């Protein structure tokens, strides 16, 4: 979306925020700094009550702990590697920018917000369901707001969570990332399917060598005698482009079909960028960013740092191994507990946030 759309969304968000702010006492909205808000609701509590009665979630949560630790370990290595490459100049600074700064330019507003809400809502709902299965009270749920824009959702657990066994806390903490990973995996076939949806493909950007013949707004009709009906058709064609080869392209312009013969560049490119119709683009972009946000939210939350889920998951791992009947595994758990405990994880927390914040600040310098 262009800058004008971003301005419209911002204006609408501010108007909504002014209305919410004026009635904040009656709707149980707590505000911070005049721009942030926490809106506590009962939204989702019935679903949590209904699904949380099944004890199967307890077993799934316990099994998820070692899986989440492994994924979190690789995420930690990736964060450190990215920071080193960022400082050495082998990674562009844009790669370290926070997601919020990418909205409007890289991430389309509407699909991006929908995808982010799906990721965070599923994440928090899973925490609530797993907590309920362990008999821990879910006090409330709610929405986090920045001006009038929803940043995400949350569930507020009872005080029993703080005093619960490490293993239980780890199982509940693993629920959110696990739910995000499931949505991530589910979105893969959906994304593949979305590329096959029948749609017109409009040229949104054109460069050499195609710019001599084609214009923005032209609709791709046919390439080398093959009708282009979907993004998948165009992607498959793009894979076959060879350097310095002639391609016959038919386009629709002003209700007329025009035919051009274009020779590809030395790099094997035609210089055409296309986009599907608005409704199809909205669907594809929503699935695409749902895919990415769930993947990133899952792995980021598994870092061994407070207040992320990974802190409780990692803290529970040695305890889980110690309780195994196998003497060797139990001994490994005892040894790991010397290195993975609340004290060492507190130090790792400082390291993780210093690396992340340092990388972000460096990328904006």
UniProtKB/Swiss-Prot annotation:
Coiled coil: none annotated. It is found in: Cell membrane. InterPro entries: MBTPS2, PDZ, PDZ_sf, Peptidase_M50. It is a multi-pass membrane protein. Pfam families: PDZ_2, Peptidase_M50. GO terms for biological process: membrane protein intracellular domain proteolysis. Gene3D superfamilies: 2.30.42.10. This is Uncharacterized protein MJ0971. It comes from Methanocaldococcus jannaschii (strain ATCC 43067 / DSM 2661 / JAL-1 / JCM 10045 / NBRC 100440) (Methanococcus jannaschii). The lineage of its organism: Archaea, Methanobacteriati, Methanobacteriota, Methanomada group, Methanococci.
């Amino acid at each position: 979306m262009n800058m004008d759309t971003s301005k419209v969304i911002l204006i609408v968000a501010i108007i909504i925020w002014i209305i919410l702010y004026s009635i904040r006492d009656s709707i149980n909205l707590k505000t911070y700094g005049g721009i942030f808000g926490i809106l506590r609701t009962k939204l989702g509590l019935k679903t949590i009550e209904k699904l949380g009665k099944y004890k199967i979630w307890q077993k799934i949560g316990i099994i998820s702990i070692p899986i989440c630790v492994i994924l979190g370990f690789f995420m930690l290595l990736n964060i450190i590697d990215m920071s080193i490459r960022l400082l050495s100049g082998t990674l562009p600074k844009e790669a370290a920018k926070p997601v919020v700064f990418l909205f409007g330019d890289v991430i389309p507003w509407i699909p991006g917000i929908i995808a982010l809400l799906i990721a965070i809502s599923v994440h928090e709902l899973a925490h609530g369901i797993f907590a309920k299965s362990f008999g821990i009270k879910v006090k409330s749920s709610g929405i986090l707001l920045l001006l009038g824009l929803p940043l995400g959702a949350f569930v507020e657990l009872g005080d029993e969570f703080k005093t619960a066994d490490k293993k239980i806390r780890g199982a509940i903490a693993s629920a959110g990332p696990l739910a995000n990973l499931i949505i991530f995996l589910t979105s893969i076939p959906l994304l593949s399917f979305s590329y096959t949806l029948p749609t017109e493909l409009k040229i949104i950007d054109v460069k050499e060598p195609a710019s001599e013949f084609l214009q923005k707004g032209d609709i791709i009709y046919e390439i080398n005698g093959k009708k282009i009906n979907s993004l998948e058709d165009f992607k498959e064609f793009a894979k076959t482009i060879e350097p310095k080869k002639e391609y016959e392209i038919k386009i629709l312009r002003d209700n007329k079909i025009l035919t051009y013969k274009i020779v590809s560049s030395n790099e094997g490119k035609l210089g055409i960028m296309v986009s599907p119709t608005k409704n199809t683009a909205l669907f594809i972009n929503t699935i695409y960013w749902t895919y990415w946000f769930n993947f990133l939210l899952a792995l980021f939350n598994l870092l061994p740092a407070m207040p992320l889920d990974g802190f409780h998951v990692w803290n529970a791992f040695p305890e889980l191994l110690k309780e195994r009947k196998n003497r060797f595994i139990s001994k490994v758990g005892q040894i790991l507990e010397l290195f993975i405990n609340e004290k060492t994880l507190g130090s790792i927390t400082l390291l993780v946030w210093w690396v992340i914040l340092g990388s972000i600040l460096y990328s904006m310098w």
